[in-house]
Structures are given as structure tokens and as C-alpha cells.
Amino acid sequence: MRAVGLGLGALLTLGGCSTLPGASDAPQLQLAPSLLPSLSYELVPYAPEPLAPADLWERLRRGYALPELHHPRITSELNWFVRHPDYLERTFTRAEPYLHFAVTEAERRGIPLELALLPVVESAFDPFAFSPARASGLWQFMPATGRLYGLQQDWWHDERRDVLKATEAAYTFLEDMHGFFEGDWLLALAAYNSGSGNVRKAQRRNQRRGKPLDFFSLDLTRETEAYVPKLLAIARLVRDPEAYELALHPLPNAPQFAVVETGGQLDLARAADLAEVDMETLYRLNPALNRWSTHPDGPHRLLLPVDKVEAFRTGLAALDASQRVAWVRHIIREGESLSVIAARYHSSVEALRRANQLRGNIIRAGDALLVPRASATEERYALSADQRERRT
């Protein structure tokens, strides 16, 4: 647009200031009034889009929006992390597959990017973290809160550990708390940890005593009083690691996984073979999966390393439907129940009912059942719920 404007300007200048011999005697160019509006234009300054940083840490810093506060509790947490650099190194190494998505989703919602670091506090970025209070996953959802935010939990999978759904649910929860506490992110974070009712109760106590209602003035549990300062301390360390003599290993500002449709239930050992990845990688990208296959009712998708997607799709397209999940024909014996048979084959009663179109639990000796079963040995499904429980 600028080039067109300058061309018109030059044309008009030449027409009015010509120095050619006899120019004053030459006929003057007249512009019809109806053409004048079409010649009006405006020069718009060119503002190039800022280049996206190659390093995810830098992208994260650019989106900081929480207040930068100085408080003894923050200093205490800072000092602990500085004394334990190995802890942060291990945690940020675990974060690498997940952090880019967490940052991208926070950016999409327009919320402070420091919130993408909350799993450092919640789970040390361990997707299988499980607390004594039964909180689970990167974002440590309790069972009831998870259900409230649409995270399904059953025998086949626990979406509190789902990388995509749990991240989205956590941000929605935080946004809800942010609105509830009238735009105060620190109170929203406190409520994420201890519940909005407990934070509101502490505010009412302070109100009766004529005290301030901000986070650092409230009398909360010891855990919650340390929770928010921990996040603020981690954010400060990420902002300026050199000031604390810490080295953050570079994280690429690029997706670390892709979402790939499976088109139906799929044995995880088969999926790992198709994608040419080890089972631990597959489970760590899909930690919601409790068993040896994806959920029969979906979602029919897997997260895979970006460089393995093409191999997986090619292999899946050539896979016969009968190879997706292995089946065995079981003859019911006297005294057997669906629960006994399900336990034997590491399946579920619901899966047996669905596969055999049973309305109830009544079965008869001598009849045959089709039973879905794993295609590999138990040991290969190293991070299934059964295998994890045996290690604890």
C-alpha cells in the first residue's frame, strides 16, 4: 500500500512542478471531481510482528502478568529452591513434554503465563503424582472437583491425568476463582489449593477484625500460605535465573506432541509398535490411560511425539481391524462370575457386558464369552494402573 501511495504522490508532483521547456504553455491536467475520492489514501506505518522466541522460557517470561512482590514468605521459598537446584532441574526436565501446551493454552485464554508453572508446585510435573488425599495428575485434581470440571474417572481411564483435558480444566477452575475473588489472582491460586470457602472464611475473619483482605494478610493453612509464595518464587527464578546462579536448560518453543485420532479402541502395545516409541513414552504422554488399551468409548485419540506421527498413521491405516484389540473365547466354568473372568483377563465387567451384549451380570456355565485382552505380557504395560500399584 505504501508503494502505491508514493507512486501517486510522485505523479502529482511531476504534474505540478515540471521544468520541461514550454511547460507553462502546455495544457494543464485536470482531474474530474468524481475521481478525486479514489485518490485519497493514508500511509500506515509498517509494524512487523515480533519474532516468536526460539526458547520457551523467553516466551513464558513475555507473558508474565502476576504482581512482582517482595515478601518474607517468597524469599523463604526462593532460598529453598536455590539450595536445591537439582530439584528444579529434575522437575523442568519432566516438564518438557507438557510445558509448551500449558503455555499455549494459557496464552490463548489471556491469563498470566506464570500459571503454566503451577504443576511445579502441584506435582513437580509428574503426570502420575497421587497424593494421600487422592489428588491426581499434573494439576492434582481431587475426584469430586475433577468430576465437577468434566474429568471422567472410571476403570479404563482417569482424565484428571489427561494432559489436555486436565490442563484446560485447571485453567477454567482458576478463571472461575479469579472471577469469584474479583480479579485477584493470588486469592484465586489460594482457592485452587484450599477451596474458595476456606479463603472466603479467612477474609470474613479479617473483615470483622478490620484487617486487610489480600492473600498475605489472611490466616490460612500452612500449606496454602506456602503454596502461592512457591509459585511466585518459581516464576522469579525463571524470570532471572542468572541472578540466583541457576542454569535453565533451553526448552524449544515448539509443540512436543501431536494429537492423533485412533479411529476406535487400540491396544497400547500395538500403538507403541506402530509409532515406534517405547511404552513409557506412550504412557507419559497419555497418563490418563489406566489399562492396556484406549477407552472403548473414547476419546479415540493418542498424544504422540511430533516426529512419530507419520509412522503411526501409516501403520494404523494398514492395520486390520482384528489387530486393534486381541480377543479370546472363554468357556464359562461352574461358579465363575463376570467379575472373576474380568479379573483373570485384566478387563472389566462393563467391557465383558458390552462385548457380549449382556444386560446384567447373569451368566451360565458352558456358554462362551468374548473377552478383550492385552496383546502383550503384563510387564510390557509398565505404567498401567495395575503395574504402578504393584510398585507402591
Across the structure, where does each feature detected by a protein language model lie?
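An acidic, Gly/Ser/Thr/Pro-rich helix-cap/linker signature
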Residues: C17-G110, L115
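Solvent-exposed, acidic/flexible segments
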Residues: F81-L99, R108-I111, S131-W139, E159-A170, ...
